[in-house]
Amino acid sequence: MPLISAPRSSAPDRPCRAIVFAHFDPHGGFDPHVTEALLRYRPHADRLVVVSTSASRLPAALRGIVDTFVPRANVGYDFGSWQAGLATLCRADFDEILCVNDSVYGPLFDLGPALRDPRTAGADLWGMVLSEQSTRRRGGRCPHVQSWFFGMRRRLLASPVYETFWNAIVPVLDKEEVVDRYELGLSVACREAGLRIAGIYDARTAGPMRLGDLWPHLSLAEPRRSWRLWKKGRRTPHNPSELAWLRLLEAGVPFVKVGLLRVNHYGLDLNRVTAALGRLHPDALPLIRGHLARCG
């Protein structure tokens, strides 16, 4: 385990911030889109920690970029990796700690405005997306900060909630239990302790998907996909990170979920999605296509 080390000197116009990046690659390497993401995170971090469950060492391109590298066994999903990365930090040194992963492409554009966004300025736990989800154990809709990008600020870092939650992380094999216990659980614990949660894109106030959102993706030439989109796309709650991807970009969220392009749960027209990304963020498209070609 790397030694706990002090942060680099923070820029005077921003909070002292650490970023813990959870990495996994099926082939054990660092994809170019991940390298690019870390390069874009670096200016916003006083300490940049990478925890990998697939690589034993950093590539040369990242050795001067990453402050701390933690290789670990592939157990415990991303929360296990964040737990290991957080253990290398003295949280009292930081105004904010971000936990992020490689399940998204991006930042596609400057992350700075999102980090200063007034919609999340007063939150103790915040993220790019706040959505609602139900699970077998919790039943009804549970508002929570989606875990692919979340930030913990001073009040949470100093709260008993922080230590109680992160000390309780243990490897869990069932993905739904991970979501229930940890992704939803962190937001629930914060709310119960009187801490505030927020998201740049808040699905509770964004409203359901409109016909105009779905219509461009419907096609008589692809009836099965179109029917899947029509049926699933109008349900609430939905996962905005994979369905409302364009709304997120327009709201200032500089990321697109990998799962949107690999799995396409809702049945969007991926040709339209990639064409739009090519228009909006042409520099990112070769990285996205390269990753999809390599990993499927």
State what each model feature region is.
Residues 1-296:
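ER/Golgi luminal nucleotide-sugar-dependent glycosyltransferases, focusing on the catalytic module
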